[in-house]
C-alpha cells in the first residue's frame, strides 16, 4: 500500500490542502509527499518556480525512484493524488508507472492546471496529461468559479488506447484554491469528501475513519466562493470566457445557486 501526493503551487503542509489531508489520512508507512512548485529554496527561486512550475520533473523523478524501490519488495496498492500543477505531475507519474507495466489503483486530481515553462504555456511539453490504461480509477474535482486566464482546467481525458479506466469528474462551487482546500474550508471539504468517496469506490481502503468523518461533517455547500486573486498582472489575467458546465457533466453541491448560473449546453 503506497500513496504519492503532489501539492499545488506554493503549497506546503502548513496550507492543509486537500492533497495533504488525504496523504495524512492514508494509513500506511509507504507514503510520499511533495510540496508544490514555488515552495522550496530562496525567495527568488520560489518566485521562478511559482511562475514556471520548475522543479516538477525533479518531483516526478524522486517519486518514480521510490515507486521502483518499493515495487521490488512487494506488489502494493498504488494511489496518486495531486492539486493544480501537482495534478499534472501526478498524471505524468501515472504514465511513467504504467510504462513499466505497473498499475495505479486510484488517481485523484484536484483541478488540474499546468502552465509549465511560462504562465501562458498551455502545452506543458514533457508532461503527458491523458490517463493511461494502467489506471483503474480516476477522479477529478473541478472548480466552476475560477476565471484566471492561466488557470485553464485540464479535463481527465483517456489516452487513445485506453478503454479500461473508470473516470469520474464533478464540478464544485468555488475558485481553484477553494476546490484544492486551501481557502474556503467548507467548500474545500465538499471536494475532499467527494474524493474520499471516489477513492473508496476504487476499492482503496486504508483511510483513517476519523478523517473521513471530519471531511463529511465539514461540508458547507452554501459557503460563498473566494474571490479570484489578482496579484501578478501577467499571471492572473481573467479569461475571456469563464469555465462552463457542459450537458452531462456532474455537479456536486448542485443546490448552490451560484453553481446553477454557470450551466451551459
Range-by-range predicted roles:
Residues 1-265:
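Active-site- or binding-pocket-proximal scaffold segments within functional domains
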Amino acid at each position: 500500500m503506497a500513496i504519492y501526493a503532489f501539492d499545488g503551487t506554493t503549497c506546503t503542509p502548513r496550507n492543509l490542502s486537500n492533497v495533504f489531508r488525504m496523504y495524512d489520512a492514508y494509513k500506511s508507512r509507504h507514503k510520499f509527499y511533495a510540496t508544490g512548485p514555488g515552495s522550496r529554496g530562496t525567495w527568488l527561486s520560489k518566485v521562478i518556480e511559482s511562475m514556471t512550475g520548475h522543479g516538477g520533473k525533479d518531483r516526478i523523478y524522486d517519486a518514480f525512484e521510490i515507486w521502483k524501490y518499493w515495487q521490488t519488495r512487494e506488489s502494493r496498492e498504488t494511489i496518486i493524488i495531486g492539486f493544480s500543477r501537482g495534478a499534472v505531475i501526478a498524471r505524468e507519474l501515472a504514465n511513467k508507472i504504467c510504462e513499466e507495466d505497473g498499475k495505479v489503483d486510484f488517481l485523484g486530481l484536484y483541478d488540474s492546471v499546468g502552465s509549465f515553462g511560462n504562465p501562458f504555456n498551455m502545452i506543458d511539453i514533457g508532461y503527458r496529461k491523458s490517463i493511461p490504461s494502467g489506471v483503474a480509477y480516476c477522479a477529478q474535482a473541478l472548480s466552476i468559479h475560477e476565471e484566471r486566464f492561466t488557470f485553464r482546467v485540464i479535463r481527465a481525458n483517456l489516452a487513445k488506447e485506453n478503454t479500461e479506466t473508470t473516470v469520474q469528474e464533478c464540478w464544485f462551487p468555488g475558485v481553484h484554491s477553494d476546490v484544492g482546500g486551501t481557502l474556503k474550508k467548507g467548500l474545500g471539504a465538499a471536494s475532499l469528501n467527494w474524493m474520499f468517496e471516489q477513492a473508496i469506490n476504487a476499492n482503496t481502503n486504508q483511510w483513517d475513519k476519523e478523517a473521513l468523518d471530519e471531511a463529511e461533517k465539514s461540508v458547507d455547500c452554501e459557503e460563498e466562493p473566494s474571490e479570484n486573486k489578482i496579484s501578478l498582472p501577467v499571471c492572473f489575467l481573467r479569461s475571456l470566457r469563464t469555465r462552463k458546465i457542459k450537458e452531462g457533466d456532474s455537479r456536486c453541491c448542485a443546490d448552490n445557486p451560484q453553481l446553477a448560473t454557470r450551466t451551459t449546453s
